[in-house]
Amino acid sequence: MVLIRVLANLLILQLSYAQKSSELVVGGHPCNINEHRFLVLVYSDGIQCGGTLINKEWMLTAAHCDGKKMKLQFGLHSKNVPNKDKQTRVPKKKYFFPCSKNFTKWDKDIMLIRLNHPVNNSTHIAPLSLPSKPPSQDTVCNIMGWGTISPTKEIYPDVPHCANINIVDHAVCRAFYPGLLEKSKTLCAGILEGGKDTCQGDSGGPLICNGQIQGIVSVGGDPCAEPRVPALYTKVFDHLDWIKSIIAGNTAATCPL
């Protein structure tokens, strides 16, 4: 089964399409408190997602994490014992690619958010660089998030978990995900032997390769971390011109909400 990797409460989720959700980092380890200064915890209408700060006023997450009441937390490590420099924001504007929220499981699952107020860089807050080039096959990349750490049970950690996975040949994902186009704007990433994966609650978080955000957690298998079932990540490099154009003030090609 294919799952969008979000965490919902007992309310019925009203997304652009309805589908059972799933995604936290399985098979990882607690992240070091200083290795995720760009990581954002997103709460929206009962959904938990991740996100990535890309400059003091802008962040990226998945389009399917959208909701009416979004709360964005920066500089967070322990949810139970927040850092003193934690900052909370809400969206000023949300941008979808390209001028539509009608994304599919394989396409357009990206949202660019302008914050209501810029965040201040601090000990636990700093942006992550946008990609200078796309990652090649077999590149080792890092995943992280507060998602479930069990592939079959909802066990959510107090601190984000991290794991290393690899960029996988897109043909492997096309074999598992029916309808995935050869030129889809996605990255296929995981461990073919299984055991490490994003999972429920990790949606919208970053896939980091060589110190740059290369992917956004989008869709994965159910259960998570199964052998030969990599997850799909929205490919940030393929949306780079759009991202830079919006940040520069050219909103003609999209619709702010």
Curated annotation (Swiss-Prot):
Residues 19-24 form a propeptide. Its main location: secreted. It is an enzyme of class 3 (hydrolase). Expressed by the venom gland. PROSITE patterns: TRYPSIN_DOM (PS50240), TRYPSIN_HIS (PS00134), TRYPSIN_SER (PS00135). The keyword Nucleus does not apply. Coiled coil: none annotated. Residues 25-248 form the Peptidase S1 domain. Keywords: Disulfide bond, Glycoprotein, Hemostasis impairing toxin, Hydrolase, Protease, Secreted, Serine protease, Signal, Toxin, Zymogen. GO terms for molecular function: serine-type endopeptidase activity; toxin activity. The active site is at H64 (charge relay system), D109 (charge relay system), S203 (charge relay system). GO terms for biological process: proteolysis. Residues 1-18 form the signal peptide. Its EC number is 3.4.21.-. Glycans are attached at N102, N120, N121. It is found in: Secreted. GO terms for cellular component: extracellular region; secretory granule. Snake venom serine protease that may act in the hemostasis system of the prey. Belongs to the peptidase S1 family. Snake venom subfamily. Monomer. This is Snake venom serine protease KN1. It comes from Trimeresurus stejnegeri (Chinese green tree viper). The lineage of its organism: Eukaryota, Metazoa, Chordata, Craniata, Vertebrata.
